[in-house]
């Protein structure tokens, strides 16, 4: 009886690399590279009030949800690279652009027209999303996601 797998195998180290890449990209984009622009964009944004719960619980929840969503994103991009047979950096760049077009571009349009966000906010979010999709796919293909 043949064995069918619906989810391709991705090395756990590739997922960990993706998590590290995403956190490093967030640190660089929201920190040294565009931190001042981000602070200006957030100072003009309307503040959202949250319930007065435990700050430790909020931080833990935020970090765990970010970690899990980044792990899923890393697995998904690695699986997509594997299933499409991508072996070159150029191919990985285009796969990353397709992922950005499917996931990041609708957010940019939403920020512009629905939420009427300012240009600095849209700029930082777009660059962050682009780095996290295109950069992650290039980093993963450079690492060697595919089985040979």
Swiss-Prot record:
Keyword terms: Membrane, Transmembrane, Transmembrane helix
Cellular location(s): Membrane
Pfam families referenced in this protein's UniProt entry, alphabetically: DUF1761
UniProt membrane topology term: Multi-pass membrane protein
Main location: membrane
InterPro entries: DUF1761 (IPR013879)
GO CC, alphabetical: membrane
Transmembrane feature ranges: 14-34, 80-102, 122-142
Domain of life, source organism: Eukaryota
UniProt record similarity statement: Belongs to the UPF0591 family.
Name the UniProt record assigns to this protein: UPF0591 membrane protein C15E1.02c
Species for this entry: Schizosaccharomyces pombe (strain 972 / ATCC 24843) (Fission yeast)
């Amino acid at each position: 009886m043949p064995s069918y797998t619906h989810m391709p195998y991705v090395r756990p180290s590739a997922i960990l690399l993706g998590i590290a890449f995403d956190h490093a990209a967030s640190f660089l984009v929201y920190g040294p590279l565009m931190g001042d622009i981000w602070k200006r964009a957030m100072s003009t944004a309307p503040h959202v009030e949250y319930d007065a719960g435990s700050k430790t619980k909020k931080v833990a929840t935020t970090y765990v949800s970010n970690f899990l969503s980044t792990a899923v994103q890393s697995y998904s991009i690695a699986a997509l690279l594997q299933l499409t047979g991508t072996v070159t950096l150029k191919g990985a760049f285009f796969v990353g652009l397709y992922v950005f077009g499917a996931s990041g571009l609708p957010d940019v349009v939403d920020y512009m027209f629905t939420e009427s966000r300012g240009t600095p906010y849209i700029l930082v979010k777009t660059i962050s999303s682009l780095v996290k999709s295109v950069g992650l796919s290039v980093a993963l293909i450079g690492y060697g996601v595919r089985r040979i």
